[in-house]
């Protein structure tokens, strides 16, 4: 594996358990259901434009099923904004899930990457933000609409954009490695954050 680049990620849907003291540990899978499954939508139609979930449906699902809807609605709002900032256009209905345990909660983000870094991949987002599929065309008003779709206060959308821009830019140096790709991706994300700030100042 020395000559192969890879990313190792610890799974959040596995719990290490022991049947009895002294016995070997085993992994137990936590029950998870992606939003397509939860909404009864075929995985073949995971993109909104193909009949897949919309963000409005995703927020409604959390209001209905989450054990902590106020928290999870904001977490999903943050996830949408974060994906927008980094250029992850592939955040479709199968990339958001519910975890079922003692409580039903929005699962942590997974399958997250900056698809905007790859010119051959689609420029259209998997789900519309406030009626807009193309991330470069998203304006501040679209985040107002996004917050309203979430059932949150209208100003929260734009406020969280500002806050997450600051967070992303502040954390970026911590993520840089010697791998050349990380520098290129970081530059792209920084550019996207800068353009977003400029739009909000207009």
What are these regions (language model features)?
Residues 1-93, 97-202:
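Anionic ligand-binding catalytic core segments
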């Amino acid at each position: 594996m020395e000559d192969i680049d890879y990313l190792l990620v610890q799974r959040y849907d596995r719990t290490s358990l022991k049947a009895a003291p002294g016995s070997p540990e085993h992994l137990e899978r936590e029950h998870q259901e992606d939003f397509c499954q939860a909404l009864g939508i075929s995985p073949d139609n995971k993109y909104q434009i193909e009949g897949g979930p919309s963000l409005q449906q995703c927020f409604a699902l959390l209001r209905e099923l989450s054990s902590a809807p106020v928290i999870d609605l904001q977490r999903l709002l943050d996830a949408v904004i974060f994906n927008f900032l980094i250029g992850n256009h592939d955040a479709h209905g199968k990339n958001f899930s519910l975890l079922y345990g003692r409580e039903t909660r929005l699962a942590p983000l997974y399958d997250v990457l900056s698809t905007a870094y790859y010119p051959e991949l689609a420029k259209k987002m998997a789900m519309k933000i406030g009626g807009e599929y193309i991330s470069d065309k998203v304006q501040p008003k679209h985040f107002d609409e996004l917050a309203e779709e979430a059932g949150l206060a209208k100003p929260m959308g734009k406020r969280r954009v500002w806050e997450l821009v600051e967070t992303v830019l502040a954390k970026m140096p911590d993520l840089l490695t010697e791998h050349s790709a990380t520098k290129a991706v970081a530059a792209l994300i920084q550019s996207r954050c800068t353009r977003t700030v400029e739009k909000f100042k207009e």
